[in-house]
Amino acid sequence: MDTPPMQRSTPQRAGSPDTLELMDLLDAAAAAAEHRARVVTSSQPDDLLFGENGVMVGREHEIVSIPSVSGLQPEPRTEDVGEELTQDDYVCEDGQDLMGSPVIPLAEVFHTRFSEAGAREPTGADRSLETVSLGTKLARSPKPPMNDGETGRGTTPPFPQAFSPVSPASPVGDAAGNDQREDQRSIPRQTTRGNSPGLPSVVHRDRQTQSISGKKPGDEQAGHAHASGDGVVLQKTQRPAQGKSPKKKTLKVKVPLPARKPGGPVPGPVEQLYHVLSDSVPAKGAKADLPFETDDTRPRKHDARGITPRVPGRSSGGKPRAFLALPGRSHAPDPIEDDSPVEKKPKSREFVSSSSSSSSWGSSSEDEDDEPRRVSVGSETTGSRSGREHAPSPSNSDDSDSNDGGSTKQNIQPGYRSISGPDPRIRKTKRLAGEPGRQRQKSFSLPRSRTPIIPPVSGPLMMPDGSPWPGSAPLPSNRVRFGPSGETREGHWEDEAVRAARARYEASTEPVPLYVPELGDPARQYRALINLIYCPDRDPIAWLQNPKLTGVNSALNQFYQKLLPPGRAGTAVTGSVASPVPHVGEAMATGEALWALPHAAAAVAMSRRYDRAQKHFILQSLRRAFASMAYPEATGSSPAARISRGHPSPTTPATQTPDPQPSAAARSLSVCPPDDRLRTPRKRKSQPVESRSLLDKIRETPVADARVADDHVVSKAKRRVSEPVTITSGPVVDPPAVITMPLDGPAPNGGFRRIPRGALHTPVPSDQARKAYCTPETIARLVDDPLFPTAWRPALSFDPGALAEIAARRPGGGDRRFGPPSGVEALRRRCAWMRQIPDPEDVRLLIIYDPLPGEDINGPLESTLATDPGPSWSPSRGGLSVVLAALSNRLCLPSTHAWAGNWTGPPDVSALNARGVLLLSTRDLAFAGAVEYLGSRLASARRRLLVLDAVALERWPRDGPALSQYHVYVRAPARPDAQAVVRWPDSAVTEGLARAVFASSRTFGPASFARIETAFANLYPGEQPLCLCRGGNVAYTVCTRAGPKTRVPLSPREYRQYVLPGFDGCKDLARQSRGLGLGAADFVDEAAHSHRAANRWGLGAALRPVFLPEGRRPGAAGPEAGDVPTWARVFCRHALLEPDPAAEPLVLPPVAGRSVALYASADEARNALPPIPRVMWPPGFGAAETVLEGSDGTRFVFGHHGGSERPAETQAGRQRRTADDREHALEPDDWEVGCEDAWDSEEGGGDDGDAPGSSFGVSIVSVAPGVLRDRRVGLRPAVKVELLSSSSSSEDEDDVWGGRGGRSPPQSRG
């Protein structure tokens, strides 16, 4: 037996009409319809509702919709289901509804009438109330023509027999009737409450026009394919204003009819409506006592059980909203509806609604089915709930408080909506998690509270309700986290690239630029990232924004890009905003709040909403906010930190009353110290606290006062009786190495920053850096180590940050307060600059540079040489490689020996050190202290220090060294794009600027070197010049055919001594040719490669570039390579400067103060420019042409083209140039032969040369990389060489093989 529906009492809300008024409305409508059925005959042709072709004739047209009265065609709705609303969300959301017609919750009246009969046994009418359907499409029926004689009074319904069903074979209406009736409109009636049998108005105000109209059968068939045959749909709406579009998507309520006996008469609609609304259901065959047979029009009495909660229906575009009340249970379908489609049983009986006004019932997506969905409210046989229960949405605390006070609640007249309360249209929509066809993950929302809620400061970080975070469950063994919370992908631990990356990850102490979950141990990467964020000499914002994936990391990144699930876009959720940061699900699973710091810093770095300064402000704020979690000992979270900072323990009072026996108290304290002096054991680790500078320590940690009393108690004679005495336990075992500046000033030999007085070349350090101080005793213990040369130890006392780093690397000891350093190798590499020049007073020039990550003047580490990919090339930022290349007068490209990525050992700068040049990096130990110490030391000797700053202004370290204007300071940042091939990689080679470099006084190069050399000549006139831009200043250690660690350039004598003996007596000519480079290009990647080139200049000897002045502003030469004048491009294309370790740089001179780009004509340029240098080969050295090969395989052939070979007597008669004029490959009288040939060739002129029909020029042959390296292109065959041991060669044989009494040059056969 079905249980009666559950009764719920709901208070009257704004916008809901009174129940009595709704009953009166329905009774009056039924009485009016039945009254007209008796008066008017059924043969009236203008009956729109109950006539022969009326709306309610057939079972397909037994759906009456009040919006169709106005003749408006409702548009289809895309409907949506949302969260269940609370009682306070009942106010309608349309502004037009505030002054329009009231909403008639007709279904609530059904439920009220039905609930009154809950105590009795349910009857057929009760069981017929099966469901309430929302979103049913309106079906427009054909309208009969209107009688002209009844224009002013509307239509009259016939007797109830008009509701008898019509056979499907006889459809109602036809196309012609539809067209004829579509133009007809009925004139509505304007009535007031209780004085007319028409549709009454609930409120005493003007109502909008309503009319009755039919629907088209096609629309009905398309929109009601799933609806049952016997049912009544009622709807309340309003007619739009003049000029506005009709309202759409109103509520439609389908009320199933009571069961009838097969073959019996079908009751009319009014009778069926009466059966639903009446208190009792008539027996089978009995005549119903209809209310319109009496004249009683008084409102019916009913109990005060209230109306069930109403749920607003969603409507798109701010359309009127109706309200629906649901019956308590559902019943079996009507047995007579045999041809009606069977609906699927719903998964849940609970009714849900949507609170958004931007969509309607049904699917919220436009591409979903437009067919409305039916929501069941009960089970078919039992009243138990099926499916998942949905918790009601939380309501606002203010609204719930106002609902509690019934006496103070505002009494709103029914039919009107409140406009004094908050606008309910401004409300977010939460979609149902279990909605059919929409699988969404369970979400959570924070409670609405005005009181701030602070999460627990200890333990794992959980959700606000204490539950674990979504997706924190253990993963399967073959899956890793990827994408949104809870999603995973398949792991690839067995891939070779992943294995190699994991080996590098385990061996590295720095954060890897690309982290994938297969690497494992995310805590290691998080610790390294936190170390990077708090590192003072690193820029975490720049590194997180662009970690510069190169080599194996780039290949690994491309490998994982191919493994992305299909359909994912680039903006898909991946769980990490930057490649170095692990998936945030690892932090969520462990509940580690500190691991959110790298994610926050990476999000700031990747954001485009902030500039550089704003990003660093946010980064500094994050550092301060997470400092207590990252470094609890340094920020005072541990007792040891409170002791070292001088803060008393919160549990132990800092002051006590005077003890009458201080000696006894002192003895007690010596045996048992107080609680606030207890210390936690220090962790033995090399963590970020070790690498942070003093500045970070001071900013985050207020250190304790350095003046610690030696006595255990204060002397009784020095204190007042009224003051308590502070009892201390004497000095602690491990005091902080760096403290704040004493109030009485620092000691002369203490450790602090010596900022010179007066004007400075560099920015002034901050107050925190200047207040740092280290006692002389601590300095003596820290610097007493063989790692630090004695002459340079005072420089450490100028930098308290360096002292703090040394102290952090030394674990605490027993008798000795500072034990041996833990990172000996790291400290040795960072203080290697102290061994460049033994005596600080021998320093003449200080060159400051900012190395790229991975660049080190000590060379790569031996342990990581095989696995470390090396530094990343940057075309805009110059590091150590660009600085050394400029000092050695050569190009620096990723394929040359000058690039640090090709080094196998440390570069040799001893030639510069011998002339007093000191190279100092911004990452070196005591960088700031060294600059300030040298400035103070030389100033005290009445000497001026020369400083050449190659660091860009934006890369200058925070709180860097302060340099007085007494010294000479030149700022010239190192710029790789000063090389034309780097500035214009696509067109520089074709324009002939492959070896051109632009020189400027504000760029690290020959122009800025000239300023330093001029100042040096004025300050030290008796000393040898600096000679900064020379080929012999720097030597590199690279891998060549002579060995994996070859010092280049290798002199010709060393080449013959170490390379040739390996092929002495070799009969395999192919092996000999490959080993000696016979027939290969003379120069590969700007360095000597072939046998004849190595035997003449040395293996790895570099070609010299041509420098073009471009003024003070970098980039003034023009935005394109074609902007360089033609004559300058011709000169650079044909100029080939042979290697010379002592040659000066070739800088094209300006004319009358103008740069090379401003020559007026070719004659002016020809007169100002030097002769075009060339490489000339003596007879017997093979072909006269010189071949250059680039890293991409492109070959340049320099020599005569288009004619026969030069006569032998011409070659023999040409004298070889000496070292003084090697840059002039031609004599002055040869200018007309050489330069004119090149000039005419560029302009399409003559081709006069040394040989008939030939001209000197350059031919470019493009081949694949690595192809034809052992075969000459268009030249004579390779030379057969008979090798002899040259260990006893004389010094005169270093330059030439023949012509000076030595061995004769190798001759070619055939």
Swiss-Prot record:
Keywords of this entry: Activator, DNA-binding, Early protein, Host cytoplasm, Host nucleus, Phosphoprotein, Transcription, Transcription regulation, Virion, Virion tegument
Residue ranges, compositional bias (Basic and acidic residues):
341-350, 1217-1227
* Residue numbers bearing the Phosphoserine modification: S686, S722
The primary site where this protein sits is: host cell
Presence of the UniProt keyword ATP-binding in the record = no
Could you state what the record's PTM comment says about this protein? Answer: Phosphorylated by ORF66 protein kinase on Ser-686 and Ser-722. Also phosphorylated by ORF47 protein kinase and by human CSNK2A1/CKII.
Residue ranges, annotated region (Disordered): 117-271, 285-454, 636-696, 1195-1258, 1282-1310
Outcome, altering R958G? In strain: Oka varicella vaccine Biken (V-Oka-Biken), Oka varicella vaccine VarilRix (V-Oka-GSK) and Oka varicella vaccine Varivax (V-Oka-Merck)
What are its GO cellular component terms? Answer: host cell cytoplasm; host cell nucleus; viral tegument
Composition bias, Acidic residues: 1228-1250
Where does the record say this protein resides?
Answer: Host nucleus; Host cytoplasm; Virion tegument
- Effect upon mutating V1197A: In strain: Oka varicella vaccine Biken (V-Oka-Biken), Oka varicella vaccine VarilRix (V-Oka-GSK) and Oka varicella vaccine Varivax (V-Oka-Merck)
Composition bias (Low complexity) maps to: 351-364, 392-407, 648-666
Q: Where is this motif: Nuclear localization signal?
A: 677-685
One Pfam family cited in the UniProt record for this chain: Herpes_ICP4_C
User: Would you indicate the residue range of the signal peptide?
Assistant: none
BP terms from Gene Ontology: DNA-templated viral transcription; positive regulation of DNA-templated transcription
Which superkingdom is the protein from?
Answer: Viruses
Keyword Heme present in the record's keywords: the answer is: no
Supply one GO molecular-function term. Answer: DNA binding
Kindly state the subunit structure of this protein.
Interacts with IE4 and IE63. Interacts with human USF1 and SP1.
Family, according to the entry, reads as follows:
Belongs to the herpesviridae ICP4 family.
The further comment given in this record reads: Encoded both by ORF62 and ORF71 within the inverted repeat sequences bounding the Us region of the VZV genome.
What is this protein's function per UniProt? Answer: Transcriptional transactivator. May interact with and recruit specific components of the general transcription machinery to viral promoters and stabilize their formation for transcription initiation. Negatively regulates its own transcription. This immediate early (EI) protein may be necessary in virion for viral pathogenesis.
Q: Please state what the protein is called.
A: Major viral transcription factor ICP4 homolog
What is the protein's species of origin?
Answer: Varicella-zoster virus (strain Oka vaccine)
